[in-house]
Amino acid sequence: MDLTDTQQAILQLIAERIESEGAPPSQTEIARAFGFKGVRAAQYHLEALEQAGAIRRIPGQARGIRLVQAPPLEKLAEPGLPDNVLRLPVLGRVAAGLPIGADIGSDDFVVLDRVFFSPAPDYLLKVQGDSMIDEGIFDGDLIGVHRTRDAHSGQIVVARIDDEITVKLLKIAKDRIRLLPRNPDYKPIEVLPDQDFSIEGLYCGLLRPNR
């Protein structure tokens, strides 16, 4: 099965969602999870997965995705390498500054040791900006993201506001959600009631490529 790293990650998401919730994600949920600007990109990858024989789609059903053969849930372990080694896709950029438009879909990947991360990440994002330097997160770093919708106040998260994504410190107080930078040169971002807001995942560590 000749799949790109993005397609393998989508296949993994489908398998995990079926395992945990009993149903596959919708095309909209896939688009959001991977930072696509619309469902057409998700449709493109689903068509490729179907052509490769990895999934079967049922016309007319919102969640009409069926696995032909489920990928192993420990897919991130690189075949032929020790269990502590991960092979993670680099799925684009994330803003450490003002939020930027989603730019996720690269098929690059990195092989690395699990010891750098807790919990184990599902993918990497390249940081753009310096708003998180007081947390040791610098422009050009690769941050690990553990995919989850749940986060607590005080955790560093990758968040989506409308069609933009950013990495910030999450602060929740009553009905107020703020995303705080860790650089005094930047102002907090207050999430407005009419904005489409979601948690894409938790920050769980970083790599600093030589530069």
From Swiss-Prot:
It catalyses: Hydrolysis of Ala-|-Gly bond in repressor LexA. This is LexA repressor. HAMAP family: LexA. Residues 27-47 bind DNA. Keywords: Autocatalytic cleavage, DNA damage, DNA repair, DNA replication, DNA-binding, Hydrolase, Repressor, SOS response, Transcription, Transcription regulation. InterPro entries: LexA, LexA-like, LexA/Signal_pep-like_sf, LexA_DNA-bd_dom, LexA_repressor, Peptidase_S24_LexA, Peptidase_S24_S26A/B/C, WH-like_DNA-bd_sf. The gene is lexA. PANTHER family: LEXA REPRESSOR, LEXA REPRESSOR-RELATED. It comes from the Bacteria. The active site is at S131 (for autocatalytic cleavage activity), K168 (for autocatalytic cleavage activity). The record marks A96, G97 as: Cleavage.
